[in-house]
Amino acid sequence: MPPLQLLRSLSALPDINPVVDFPAPNPAPKSTVAGDAFPSVYSTLAPHALTNLVFKHYDIEVPKGCRFWHRGLSDVYLVETLADDYILRISHQHWRTESEIQFELELLNFLADRDVPVAAPLRHRDGGYALEINAPEGKRYASLFPYAPGGVAIGDLSKTQGFLLGEMLAQLHQTAQRFKPSAHRPPLTLSYLLDDSLHTIAPFLHHRLEEWRCLIDISMAIKTQLTSIPTHTPYWTICWGDPHSGNVHFTAEDQMMLFDFDQCGMGWRAFDIAKFLQVSMQSGLGRNIRDAFLSGYNSIAPLTVLEENSLQALTQTAFIWSWAIHVQTLKLSDYSRLHGSYFKRRLENLQQLGSTDWQLF
């Protein structure tokens, strides 16, 4: 829905606090008496059971341990064997469809086959790359990856690493122009990045109309500025979706391995750069390193003047998209943080990104 229609529809929202609109579990229990399965929306799978699953379906050494490593947009487990370590990623039923997951895995295999250093999924014994799990809340999907050598840059990226990462992103974009997926996932259009995000945020600004109107005005200005960017190559290609220093490992020799393509999709290559800038500024990465990243990218695939002039609006777009994803996550895991000051602070950060000194923040 366009922003103006969203604004008009805001007055029609019920005068209640926003609630989490979860799909019913499949199949939904008919009752919740003792002995029946209670409905679930966000289960935690037992590491010992996942150890057995991995050993049964993958040609790896006997696991000596499995640890719940991180909960984010997927649940991540570290699987350890005597010889090697692996990352087991379990999708969330409410976040990704089977088709969206297959798209990502196809992309990773495509890039790895063309010498782009990505952590590609391992094939299981049945020939596929994802295992279906019947979790209490519905179907989830497990994929196993080799543990990326090296580690996250200590104290964040150096200038050299920033330059190298920019170079690699440009090479990824060029290589991915030939990617022909069999699976579908939504492209990173302004409708997906902005309009859908506003739908997520809108109910929480029901009683904060001034802030809502400000958000609408910013979104409309972004759309006006970005309407002239073409949607064909080289401007439009496969995007990583979340390029930043936390999603790449560097060895001591500055060899890199990229991972976490959960937010990938067809989009503007300049959006990937803007996403790097948005995350980097939010985490406090120095301007000199951000500039080195841009220099690295331009050394392989120079941006046009139109794209360079669009980076600020695209960085704001990336911020709004990330904001909406964060809201969706908090609705599941920490609703107490979704209070007025949270939205006030986020809007202030967004306004800073729209200032003439936006690169200073």
Curated annotation (Swiss-Prot):
PANTHER family cross-referenced by the UniProt entry: AMINOGLYCOSIDE PHOSPHOTRANSFERASE DOMAIN-CONTAINING PROTEIN, AMINOGLYCOSIDE PHOSPHOTRANSFERASE DOMAIN-CONTAINING PROTEIN-RELATED
Pfam families per record: APH
A Gene Ontology biological process term: threonine biosynthetic process
Protein known as: Uncharacterized protein sll1119
Organism listed in the record: Synechocystis sp. (strain ATCC 27184 / PCC 6803 / Kazusa)
Family: Belongs to the pseudomonas-type ThrB family.
Gene3D superfamilies documented for this protein: 3.90.1200.10, Phosphorylase Kinase, domain 1
One GO molecular-function entry: homoserine kinase activity
Taxonomic path: Bacteria, Bacillati, Cyanobacteriota, Cyanophyceae, Synechococcales
